[in-house]
């Protein structure tokens, strides 16, 4: 029922929307993707590209569309599974709670997704799949490297439009971008090995 989403706070629209984009992209690039999940993932990506920012800005028709897109993305990943973006988001959420804030799941996905795409694209199969996503989004580029660069730029631009930081360093206690985030760099680096080990053990990895 899309009416349930009409009164969502703007920040929640942004975070859940980028969570859905991550669901769809990870499902499409998953090693368990198949003929049944690919169309769901790609159509969800296209709808999110078209409607998320408008939904964030208060367009209720686009909010309705996003409700459907998020369901499609969920259907895709429920059958194709997810990836390391979600694994890291799961393990960093409360990792710095003693510093007074939580890294919200959707914001974590949005921050990590461009970085994971850049890393995963070292694998030729993943690179081809990311290139196909960029083609479906009509981002341009004549080689997979160009397409992936454009995809990463697009996602970072979407984060900017949704007021989501690019990294933990700039993640404010209210989840908005700030020059100096609530997690000190030395604390982040100290806890990183444990976070990485926990992410490897996550069901999404």
Predicted ranges, named:
Residues 27-154:
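Active-site segments that bind and position negatively charged phosphate/pyrophosphate groups
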Residues 134-205:
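C-terminal charged capping/lid subdomain of soluble metabolic enzymes
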Residues 1-33, 128-132:
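A glycine/threonine-rich phosphate-anchoring loop and its flanking beta-alpha core
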């Amino acid at each position: 029922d899309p009416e349930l989403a009409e009164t969502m706070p703007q920040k929640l629209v942004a975070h859940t929307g980028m969570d859905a984009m991550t669901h769809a992209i990870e499902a499409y690039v998953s090693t368990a993707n198949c003929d049944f999940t690919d169309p769901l993932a790609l159509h969800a990506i296209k709808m999110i590209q078209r409607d998320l920012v408008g939904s964030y800005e208060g367009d209720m028709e686009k909010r309705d569309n996003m409700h459907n897109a998020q369901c499609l993305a969920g259907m895709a990943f429920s059958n194709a599974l997810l990836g390391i973006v979600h694994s890291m988001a799961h393990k960093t959420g409360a990792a710095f709670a003693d510093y007074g804030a939580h890294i919200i799941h959707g914001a974590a996905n949005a921050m990590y997704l461009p970085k994971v795409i850049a890393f995963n694209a070292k694998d030729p199969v993943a690179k081809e799949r990311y290139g196909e996503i960029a083609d479906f989004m009509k981002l341009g580029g004549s080689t997979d490297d160009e397409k992936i660069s454009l995809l990463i730029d697009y996602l970072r631009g979407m984060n900017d439009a949704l007021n989501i930081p690019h990294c933990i360093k700039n993640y404010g206690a209210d989840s908005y971008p700030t020059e100096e985030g609530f997690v000190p760099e030395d604390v982040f680096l100290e806890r990183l090995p444990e976070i990485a080990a926990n992410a490897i053990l996550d069901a999404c990895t």
